[in-house]
C-alpha cells in the first residue's frame, strides 16, 4: 500500500516514506538497505560483514548473528532474516544433505542455495594439546575421557552435528562428555578454551587460527548460504556474494587457514 495520510480532505505523501516504498517495490527491492544474516558462525564471513558495514556507514544496515544452522533456517522460514548460513556434515555429502535439510522448513521452495566455500572442521584445543596429538603422545579419541573439559555449541548448530558424527564412530555420545556448557558461537567456544575454562571443542580451523589455538582436523565441510529468491538480486546480497571471490578476502581466509574457494559463488540448489 502506498504510504499516505489524509488530512482535511487532502492526501499527503511523506517523501522519506514514499522513497522507501519505491525502492522496496522496484525490482523486488533491489536497492533495499537491509541485510540480516543468521545461522552458522564463520570468522571470514564476520570479516566480510564488518568490512561491508564500515564501507556502507549509515546508508544501510547489515547484521550477522550466529544462531546455529537450524535456528537460522527457522528464522528464515518466518521471514525474520534475509540470508542463512548453513553447514551440515561432510562436504562430499552436502549436495544431498543440505537440500534435504532445507526441505524440512516451510518456504524452502522460494530459496536458493549458494556455495560460499569449503572449510576444515575439527577439534579446537590448546597448542600444547595439539602438539601432543601431532607427536602422537595423545590420540584424538583420548580427549573423550572424563578428564578433558568440553565446550559445546547450542543444539541445532552444524558443529554439534559434526561432533555427534565423529563421536558415533568411536561409540560415544555427547552426553558422555564432560561439558562446561553450551556456547552460542564459535568465537565464544574458542574464547573459553583460550581462557583455560575448557580444553576442547568442535569448530572450524579458521576459528582456531583467529585465536592462535591448536586444531585437529576431522572433516572438510561445505559452508553455504540460503537466500530467498525474491531478494537474491538485491544490492547488498550481491555485494556479499562478490566479496567471496575478492583476492584480498581470500587472502585473509588463507591466513586463518582451512578454506577452499574453488567453487565460491556457485548456485548448488534451487527450491521448486
Summary of predicted features, one role per range:
Residues 87-102, 190-219:
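A ligand-binding cleft/hinge motif common to bilobed small-molecule-binding domains
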Residues 107-122, 209, 213-242, 263:
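Periplasmic-binding protein-like
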Residues 37-43, 89, 121, 125-133, ...:
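Short coil/turn segments
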Residues 60-68, 174-186:
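Short beta-strand-to-loop elements that line the ligand-binding cleft
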Residues 30-31, 45-130:
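N-terminal segment of the mature folded domain
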Residues 3-25:
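Short helix-start
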Residues 116, 125-150:
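Flexible hinge/capping segments at coil-to-helix
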Residues 31-41, 138-163:
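Short loop->beta-strand "edge-of-pocket" segments that line small-molecule binding or catalytic clefts
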